[in-house]
């Protein structure tokens, strides 16, 4: 038998083996729908999630979560396509990270005019407001997000963990897990440590099961 015949025979055997073994079958075409989570996406508790600022390629993924509320901690305003997506899916965006004419018009109910540097860390008042939204199960399923899903989101989730009774070492470890190669910010960790968790107003009739 020639080398050519041997090669053809071997090829036929390989095809037969592939047909009989599902693990060897090649995918003929890519999936029709690409499901891509936002940067640094991670579940926090049941129906509570965290991530970086979502983009258009993440919308199919977000649809699967059936979100009711997005807690927006990013210092910049959302893109128009994201606002349209949220409106089409009846998702309420709560603006906590930015306080300006845009956010006041949308959701931020306040009678005060506040000037905020977009590069500043969150202050105690904004953390308190964020946590009071999180501890209300009527807002669920809920996504907490900021620009990269690191420091602002990490601050709020860190204070939430303290509210849950976590020790500071565990809180710090979780925060740094999302900060990447640059590591955590000492000012963020100090803010988490010093935050007055007793200032958070919790309605016992609306508290999530994992906090009871």
Curated annotation (Swiss-Prot):
One of its GO terms (cellular component) is cytoplasm. Keywords: Cytoplasm, Hydrolase, Protein phosphatase, Stress response. Its main location: cytoplasm. Residues 40-208 form the Tyrosine-protein phosphatase domain. Residues 12-22 have a biased composition (Basic and acidic residues). Its EC number is 3.1.3.48. Residues 1-27 are annotated as: Disordered. It is an enzyme of class 3 (hydrolase). PROSITE patterns: TYR_PHOSPHATASE_DUAL. The active site is at 146 (phosphocysteine intermediate). Pfam families: Y_phosphatase2. It is found in: Cytoplasm. It catalyses: O-phospho-L-tyrosyl-[protein] + H2O = L-tyrosyl-[protein] + phosphate. GO terms for biological process: cellular response to oxidative stress. GO terms for molecular function: protein tyrosine phosphatase activity. Belongs to the protein-tyrosine phosphatase family. Putative tyrosine-protein phosphatase required for protection against superoxide stress. This is Putative tyrosine-protein phosphatase OCA1. It comes from Scheffersomyces stipitis (strain ATCC 58785 / CBS 6054 / NBRC 10063 / NRRL Y-11545) (Yeast). The gene is OCA1.
């Amino acid at each position: 038998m020639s080398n050519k015949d041997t090669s053809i025979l071997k090829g036929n055997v390989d095809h037969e083996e592939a047909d009989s073994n599902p693990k060897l079958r090649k995918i003929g075409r890519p999936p029709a729908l690409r499901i891509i989570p936002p940067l640094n996406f991670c579940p926090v508790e049941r129906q509570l999630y965290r991530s970086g600022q979502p983009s258009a390629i993440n919308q199919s993924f977000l649809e699967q979560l059936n979100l009711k509320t997005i807690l927006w901690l990013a210092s910049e305003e959302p893109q128009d396509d994201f606002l349209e997506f949220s409106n089409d899916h009846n998702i309420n965006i709560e603006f906590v990270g930015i306080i300006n004419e845009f956010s006041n018009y949308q959701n931020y109910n306040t009678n005060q005019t506040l000037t905020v540097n977009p590069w500043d860390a969150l202050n105690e008042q904004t953390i308190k407001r964020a946590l009071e939204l999180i501890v209300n199960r009527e807002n669920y399923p809920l996504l907490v997000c900021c620009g990269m899903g690191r420091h602002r989101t990490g601050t709020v989730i860190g204070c939430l963990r303290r509210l849950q009774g976590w020790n500071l070492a565990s809180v710090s470890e979780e925060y740094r897990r999302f900060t990447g190669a640059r590591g955590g910010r000492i000012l963020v960790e100090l803010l988490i440590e010093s935050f007055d968790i007793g200032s958070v107003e919790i309605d016992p009739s609306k508290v999530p099961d994992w906090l009871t």
